[in-house]
Amino acid sequence: MSNPNLKENKFKRAIAVSLRGIIKAISPVAYVKCQYRYITHHKCHLNPPVRYTEKLQYLRLFVYPKDDNVSLCAGRVSVRDYVEYRGYVDSLIPVYGVYNSFDEIDFSSLPKSFVMKCSHASGFNEIVWDKDAMDLSASRKRFKKWLKTDYGKKTVEPHYSKIHPQIIIEKLLEEDGALPVEYKIHVFNGKAKNLYVVTGRGEDI
């Protein structure tokens, strides 16, 4: 016998998803304010922004969409040209290939392990430890869906919508069979202020 509560919860989730989509389309600002309130339990002040997190929302809505350099640096492929231009080519992770579709990839030419990423989004990644164990059908389906996704529209981060969707395959960086410790430096007004250390990551990159 089916669980009526489960059906009710699925229905409520479907309604919530539909409402989020409608609010995003009608008023991205209203959506971001609702999202901010839900996550932080604070009202989102944008005129002017006061909290650091409010300033991030202001940039997301009103500044980044007008600055092509933000899209340039957010793109996983395009940012490589910028890094090279700035003289830091030695800091780039080696790339095995850049592709416009999954079916362009010649897996026989790739090493045993690597990382596959979409150029135009965050979180659209797949870590491959052993290509012989890959479920190519599942990967193909996943990346075809990702490449068709307008990530900027999905997340209300419009600068992502300017990035050409591609698949980039990079060398897998690992330490003793695990992902390495990641260090993120937060820079404010040109000065490094905070160090964020990420450890114990699984498949989420």
Short names for language-model regions:
Residues 14-16, 25, 30, 74, ...:
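A sequence-composition feature that detects small, non-aromatic residues
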Residues 110, 136-205:
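Phosphate-binding site of ATP-dependent enzymes
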Residues 15, 22-26, 39, 93, ...:
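Weak global preference for isoleucine
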